[in-house]
Amino acid sequence: MGDISKHNIFSLPEDILAKLELREEYSVEEKTDSANLSNQGDIVDSTQKNISSCVNCQIDNLHTLDERKSHIKSDWHRFNTKRKITKLPPVSQDEFESIIEDLPESLSGSESETNSESEEDNFQIEKAFKQSLNIGKVDSADENNNQRTNSPLTWFQLSNASAEVPTYIGVYKHMFSGNNHITKDLLVQQQNHNRQKPLQLAMFMVGGGHFAAMIASNEFNPRDPHVPKVLAQKTIHRYTTRRKQGGSQGAADNTKGNIHSAGSGLRRYNEQALIKDIQQVFKDWGKLLETCDLIFVRAIGSSNRSIFFSQPGALISPKDPKLRVFPFTTKRATHSELLRCYKELVTPKISHVDSISIKAQEEERKRQAEIEKEIRQSRLQEEERKKKKLAKYTEVIISNLKASNIEAFLEYLRSNDLSINFQFYPKNVHLHTSTPLHYAVTQKNAKLVAKLLRNGADPAMLNGNGKTPFEISTGNKEVKDEFLIARHELGESFFDWEAAKVGAPQSREQIQKQRQKAKTKLENQRRDKERQEELRRKEAMQKIEEQSKRDYDKLHGEGHSLGINNVRKVDELQSLSPEMRMRIEREKRAAAAMKRMQTK
């Protein structure tokens, strides 16, 4: 087995090729335990713990220690770790790339691996994680499907009668034309063809302002068959990602519109410059690309994919049969990463697992999946019951408060072990009145507010709009006064009155004096107004009587009146209030009646 690791998949020895037998059930269902996969050919006991798999991501193709370290530092692994903490199922790499489609540019950085834990990357993982919470639950049919059903590997068994545990050799389908069905004949045919004309590959990666490209030949290298002959290579880096916020400037512009700043302008310029630089690489490598047998591209996100497939005169078509994606986790777009990916693609994978262990472990996976499914369903049912119970609590509490039945309210809290600061549910319905104290304030019930405060209702609690009860009591002076009185009587240490935005403390006597003073002031103002109205009434009556006398004299004396005095009289009446005019009219009618009686 040690000899196999010294070759790549296109330079396997003839004696090894002769002993290979395609394992259909192995390659289709991918039942291998990758704890036993090794590029070095070390035989591992099938009972040992699976150290080459990742439980968080549910993969088991981590063949070496370096690959395991690399995977642990990858954004995909960190993302699934966050999901596991919150009891959510992991996502596949394709799902992860779909989630971060509009965010991914900032997930790629420099070649330094220490940068993978940078503040920008952490922010992006957090952003992608929050976005993933909007993804619906996986249906049961999908849960039953093993994510390795469409495995990128095809497995061959190495027939060896003397071996107690069978040996399997895996090759990536992506390295063959028509990669859906790889046979032994195709593997032998490809090896013969590779000797005559070495396989030529083009590899491209772009993301986060980083671009790496390489055209390599699988020409035999006697020193290391896993190292290609590099025909051309290019790396480019441009500042295009938004620090802290994350994502590309173009994605931000599409969402929020153009932002005018020095940094945004520079990023827009660099995005266009990066596209031009990549197009120039394609133009310079045009003839080499035509001779390539396979083209591997990693371009996550619509903006990155458009660089390869949507630009004028694009040399790569999305329907090109030579086009491939990398069938494993990749890191930042650097030349060393391209070399690592090449080595991963051409290195045969070796597994020492017996069929009994495979079936047992597969059954264990299915059993664990069923258990996890039951746990998720149970958790959902429990959450639904909890929501209904909270809604019922809210309904009863509001009913008691509305009736000002504080005793029934407190008894209900005690019997159901609820806090007096109980948060009403659902929160989106009770944004303004989130707690009993908020509700009592909106009901303008000062007595209820006073009782709630003295029973421990916290005035510093915020409602759904971020307001304290005191802040929403601005329309009722009596309710506001109860907060000031409570602050005085309960003391400064009873609640955080400053956080509650409650004003300076005042005693009930002070409040009553203020109310009495205000009441006296209003009463005095009312009396002053009545005195002024009475004075105006008397003056108006006097003027009317005098005018009536003059009118009578003129009516029975010389000449006839032109009615000017009547106009003046009407004007004077118009200046009075409606009540005063009515009183004057009644008195005028009474005076006229008396005069008629005297003349008879």
UniProtKB/Swiss-Prot annotation:
- Residue ranges of the ANK repeats are 432-461, 465-492
Parts forming coiled coils: 359-392, 506-550
The active-site annotation reads 249
Q: GO cellular component terms?
A: Cdc48p-Npl4p-Vms1p AAA ATPase complex; cytoplasmic side of mitochondrial outer membrane; cytosol; endoplasmic reticulum membrane
A single GO BP:
ERAD pathway
> Region (Disordered): which ranges?
239-263, 517-563
Q: Which UniProt keywords apply?
A: ANK repeat, Coiled coil, Cytoplasm, Endonuclease, Endoplasmic reticulum, Hydrolase, Membrane, Mitochondrion, Nuclease, Phosphoprotein, Repeat
Feature: compositional bias, Basic and acidic residues: 520-559
Q: Please quote what the entry notes about the protein's domains.
A: The VLRF1 domain mediates binding to the 60S ribosomal subunit.
What is stated as this protein's family in its record? Belongs to the ANKZF1/VMS1 family.
Q: What is this protein called?
A: tRNA endonuclease vms1
